[in-house]
Amino acid sequence: MFQKCEAIVIRAIDYGETNKIVTLFTREWGKVAAMARGAKKPSSRLSAVTQPLAYGHYLIRRSRGVGLLHQGELIDSMRVLREDLFAAAYAAYIVELTDKSTEEQKRNPYLFELLLQTLQYMSEGRDLEIMTFIYEMKMLSVLGIPPVLDRCARCGATEGRFSFSVKEAGFLCHRCESADPHRFPLSPASIRLLRLFYHIDLTRLGAISVKEGTKAELRAVLSSYYDEYAGLSLKAKRFLQQIGELKGTLDPGDGRNN
């Protein structure tokens, strides 16, 4: 029996000469895989709806393994994210993080909405790195590794100067900071943003402007925290790091990351 779902294509691989196997992150069932027969043919009605990042309604026959994709109706191709090198790199990281962090057929409508909203904001021209930071912060609860952000992770203090400790999985106050010689000193702006990004309702996100120095602090904290606790090996992360180095020497030209 074919069933209708709302989904985002988070992975697509070629299978044989004309077919694809697509991984869809659906609102209704979570992550599912489906065979798209003939989708590699440019003339196929499944060609556009099986492109990475495509968002639409799909009719599939589910199974315990790989199901069958019968048809799809495109809502948003997210084309702008595929055609810009920098946007494509950030979007690829977002969807791979989602893919590697979730189990097959485990429903999570909150995560679906988070992924959709993040990609839409990116396609609208929001700061790619800021949107990635927000997504990474929110994924920590999905992964079951939330940091302590509302108090000192050791003594519970809520006032004073704070740094971030990967070892203690959260903030350390100035009285406890000696517990981790490898802690990250943070500016007040970085502390506020880590808390904001973790708790913010994305549907109410306004304009956020962040200095490059603050971005560097956030980048270092999140990268180290994920390396320590997430246990994920992401190809897109390595590519994103290379893109970050390229950003230092080239102007992307569209103002996305300024």
Curated annotation (Swiss-Prot):
Task: Supply the SUPFAM superfamilies for this chain.
Answer: ArfGap/RecO-like zinc finger, Nucleic acid-binding proteins
Gene Ontology biological process terms, A to Z: DNA recombination; double-strand break repair
A GO cellular component entry from the record: bacterial nucleoid
Keywords assigned by UniProt? DNA damage, DNA recombination, DNA repair
Q: Which domain of life does the UniProt lineage start with? A: Bacteria
A Pfam family per the record? RecO_C
Q: What does this protein do?
A: Involved in DNA repair and RecF pathway recombination.
Which family does the record assign? Belongs to the RecO family.
Q: What is this protein called?
A: DNA repair protein RecO
Q: Which organism is it from?
A: Geobacillus thermodenitrificans (strain NG80-2)
What lineage is on file? Answer: Bacteria, Bacillati, Bacillota, Bacilli, Bacillales
